[in-house]
Amino acid sequence: MLRLALLVLSSMLLAILPWRPQSAFASPPKQEMAFTSPQAILGWINQYRSRPEPMRLPLAVKAMSALGVFRDLDGSGVYIGFMAGVLGANPQKADRLITAMFPMPPEDQVAVVRGIAYSGLPDWRAVLQRFSERMPARAILIKRLIDGKLPTLEKLPLDTSPAALDTLWGYYFASGRKEPVDRIIDALQWATEGNSVDKLTAGSMAKWTLANNALQRKDLLDHLKAEKRRRPKAVADQLAEVIEAAETYETSQIRKRALAAIEDLKRKGPESARKMSYWGMAGQTALALGCVVAGAMGHVEIAVPCVVGGAASSAAIKMLTPQ
């Protein structure tokens, strides 16, 4: 009888209570940034360290593949570096994260291979070997990386490709580790280079991206100040200008002076210095455009990091080429 009475009472209460859909009682779901464009992915990368979400990496990597960012070899550095940084910062989850990135088109597997090789995981060679069966089309690349015939992140040359500089930035954005930043600081020795346009461009891009990213990140600015005290005078002087530009929000002066120096060397320097590779042209284009193309074209509300690749893409170069 007691059970019957309780059932009747419950039915009466349900009848007099106003009905609401279940969703009305549920807490609102967390808003997650959708990876609908390269700019949206860059926005997520930019704020990642304030809210790390390593388990979203596979979804982001699949979006990168679908959006075609890996196929722009010079523009994909920040994405590959970021992938490597997340894997390196989460060694216990690395296998699970990589597994969830598959299936992946063979042409985009190069990015996954490099992401693993650049991760800094203590056993990255073993990890790469484990996943080699899923990437038979990349067997030669995998073997050369494992055998040490291709450089890993800490040995990538900075004066031959914009991708190397961006890859270091991507790793830093994911992990907060200072080793990639220190390599970028090393390139400041070329900021006054008088014998190679490529090296002058690389040094200028290092200086420009350091200033713009330090402007957004206090921990990075503090690290640059600490490095200034221990670096040789030539690099310390460049760091002083970077710090001043970041603290006064006057980074445009670095860009203008760099462009003028490159043009001057091309015009007046010895013939050997005037020769400019694709990297030199792409880097100069990136300086001319600033971080705008790497940022959100038409989406200024999305904060993005300052990287070279977006502005060094073929589309950006076309924008500056007379039609």
Predicted regions and their residues:
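Non-catalytic all-alpha helical scaffold/repeat segments
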Residues: 25-323
